């Protein structure tokens, strides 16, 4: 009987420690959680109301992608296929920062995103801003 109780206690301790480790890891975010292909939807709500869809990849904190906006340039051409590069970081609490720098591709603006990853680490919500005084909301999903 003592052996049965002892073996049951040992198995219970092992299972409890594994469950605790799983749930501790589940709640924290790491750089690897950003890696992959994402699609983001934005809505500017302050200076020049418009929407945007951006598709991008993140690898080792480096961001590359393109955006389509519901705006036109001075000649009336739609602002679609705009390329950008940037950087992304994430904290253990799953708050993240991401930049979209359009300047290397002839567009004079950088957008900064302040995001919160969902606990499944496959979606986010947040806000963004740029140097022109634009302010908006953002949400996205990992593909």
Q: Which residues fall in each region the model found?
A:
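Amphipathic/hydrophobic helical signal segments and adjacent flexible N-terminal regions
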Residues: 2-47, 135-143
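Short loop/beta submotifs within extracellular cysteine-rich repeat domains
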Residues: 46-48, 64, 106, 123-125, ...
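N-terminal glycine/threonine-rich, aromatic-flanked beta-hairpin/loop signature
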Residues: 48-95
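Repeated polar recognition positions within modular binding domains
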Residues: 49-51, 108-110, 130
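A short local loop/turn or secondary-structure capping micro-motif enriched for an aromatic residue
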Residues: 72-76, 105-108, 132-136
